């Protein structure tokens, strides 16, 4: 696990040290706050695993989330046309972000998912590390925001995504 702390003022570092073990290593890095996209770029450079999965500090993973992602990754491990695994995001009240879905699995580009199949809502993406390293976010002085859609739309031009209809991420959005 790589944890990039980009400016928290709480006890995140102490908490990580408390969770660390040889079976559950956490690599903690504290960097100045230059925006989420910069923190993601930093984490990508440190990543050594096969898949890169982003979890925001104020969100949670439901039980069996990582297990479900690993199961899905095994289904497509030999298919190099698929670079992204997408489970579904749910609100903490149990509703799926974007409403209910009527599929179990679908393989398509992120652009087709939204514009051809008209599926709404955010998903929780795990990206092959070898692929995401080719598509870093642009970084500009004094710019602290870059939409994640930029990254996924760039990847969608060359690769497909394996979408699976399971809750792997719990979130709340600011309104």
Segments from the language model and where they lie:
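A conserved acidic beta->alpha catalytic loop
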Residues: 5-14, 56
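Conserved nucleotide-sugar donor-binding catalytic segment
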Residues: 91, 95-175
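Short aromatic/hydrophobic "clamp" motif used to bind/position activated sugar donors
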Residues: 52
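Short beta-strand/loop segment that forms part of the nucleotide-sugar
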Residues: 1-7, 27-32
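Conserved donor NDP-sugar-binding/catalytic core segment of glycosyltransferases
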Residues: 64-99
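Acidic donor-diphosphate engagement hotspot in glycosyltransferases and nucleotidyltransferases
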Residues: 12, 40, 61-69
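Glycine-rich, basic loop-to-helix element that forms the pyrophosphate-binding segment
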Residues: 31-47
């Amino acid at each position: 696990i790589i944890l990039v702390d980009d400016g928290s003022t709480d006890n995140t570092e102490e908490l990580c040290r408390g969770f660390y073990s040889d079976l559950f290593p956490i690599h903690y890095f504290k960097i100045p706050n230059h925006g989420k996209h910069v923190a993601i770029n930093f984490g990508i450079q440190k990543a050594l695993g096969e898949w890169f999965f982003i979890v925001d500090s104020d969100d949670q993973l439901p039980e069996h989330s990582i297990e479900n992602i690993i199961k899905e990754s095994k289904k497509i491990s030999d298919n190099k046309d698929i670079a992204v695994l997408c489970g579904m995001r749910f609100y903490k009240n149990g509703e799926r972000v974007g409403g209910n879905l009527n599929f179990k699995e679908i393989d398509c580009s992120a652009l087709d998912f939204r514009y051809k199949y008209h599926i709404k809502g955010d998903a929780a993406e795990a990206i092959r590390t070898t692929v995401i390293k080719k598509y870093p976010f642009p970084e500009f002085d004094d710019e602290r925001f870059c939409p994640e859609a930029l990254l996924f739309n760039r990847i969608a031009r060359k690769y497909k995504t394996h979408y699976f209809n399971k809750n792997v991420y719990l979130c709340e959005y600011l309104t």
